Amino acid sequence: MGANGNVGLIRMGSWCVYSSIRRTFQIRKAQHGFSPHIITHFPGWVYCEEFGIEVQGFFCLLPDMAFHNTLIMSRLINFMVMTNHFRVPFNQPCLVGREFEYLADAIRMRHVSGDGTYTKKCHTLLEQTLGVSKALLTTSCTHALEMAALLLDIQPGDEVVVPSFTFVSTANAFVLRGARPVFIDIRPDTLNLDETRLECLITSRTRAIVPVHYAGVGCEMDVILEIASRYNIAVVEDNAHGLFGKYKNKYLGTFGCLATQSFHETKNFTCGEGGALLVNDPQYIERAEIIREKGTNRSRFFRGEVDKYTWVDVGSSYLPSDLLAAFLYAQLEAREQIQAKRQRIWKYYDEHLRDWARARGVRLPSVPSHCEQSYHLFYLLMPDLKARTRLISHLRERGVSSVFHYLPLHLSPMGQQFGGRIGDCPVTEKVSDCLVRLPLYNDLRREDQDWVIEAIWEAQW
């Protein structure tokens, strides 16, 4: 309470439980001799010496002078917003134990640019585990997709079939080469490319099909590959979500002539920013190395195959630092541990939300029996946009960060330039309005997951 007996309250949320903090106020007043004010949405114990404040749970206790200091309050609120404090964040990058060791080792070896020792370790691990002809780390999955477009020699006027329900990079990588994206709708069960709609979209100008394994659940690759083979069209798998997932006992990313991976902060295995190009058709290996090395044959030079290297083709700088590769290698080494954690979290959501979802008309993820998913994300398909909006708002009030996902690419400003119209992809349009993703990261604690589940049970719409 302040000098006038009132509590100064700045509401960053609406889930203050006043009875649970009354005793805290009394204790802090006795210990520190000041009357607290409150700011919500601030998890964990924090002490900010600069501000002279203390934080417990979701409540920030301020001395009276701090509460009335405009500069302090402005900086504090900005700090809270910028650091995105939730009791349960949507995503949190997790360490597995050897990242710092490998980073220090890479620094000691005095090779921190691309294609150092740890880059080669990552390449070998991916090639041997997945059985691909070649794996090449890149600076992002976006850049791996751009490399794929260059390798396929995509030209202006070519057409590339991509799902409308995907990240912009899936389409943009080919648009950069002058191609026209042809947007295909998704299946209502797995949210993957609807293979039954594929053949009717193919024309004489179609050069590639890009299936996206949404949430790490495999697309129906048998059908896609059969159609692609019949029309002599390349298949590039966007496997950003699906590393180590399987379709009919075969790893995702090993079906198309090329495939791409993501090691972004939000993915199962991360180095902050990064990706990989998987080459399944050996005819593309040499040119892939050239494109990745600024259009030079530098890789052949370092293997002793030529006495000097020079500019031989188009290309760019797609090599990540070996520091990033060192971090990533620690994560890839722990792949079984990471996947086991994510599997437990995913199944716990599924088990504890299934009855609730059935009663409330909500759909949970669908995984066909012939697919082994990667446990990349867990989502709810709400009845409509209004229900989705209210659930996200309710979870935010309870300190839980939940998010929607892709907006339909065919209805984006850029997509409309390629002829996209409302109604072209009706399943995508519906799913985009209804889907909400729940927190899922390797170190999500059971008590925090229970908090999320209980908050969902309480939600009304």
Q: PLM features: residue spans?
A:
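Short hydrophobic alpha-helical segments enriched in small aliphatic residues
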Residues: 5-7, 17, 33, 38, ...
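N-terminal "arm"/small-domain region of PLP-dependent enzymes with the aminotransferase-like
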Residues: 56, 74-113, 310-312, 439
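PLP-dependent aminotransferase class I/II
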Residues: 78-79, 119-124, 129-135, 196, ...
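Phosphate-binding glycine-rich loop
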Residues: 115-159, 173-177, 183-184, 250
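PLP-dependent aminotransferase-like
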Residues: 150-239, 246
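Conserved active-site segment immediately N-terminal to the catalytic lysine
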Residues: 237-271, 300-302, 307-312
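Short beta-strand-to-turn element immediately C-terminal to the catalytic PLP-Schiff-base lysine
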Residues: 261-262, 275-280, 329
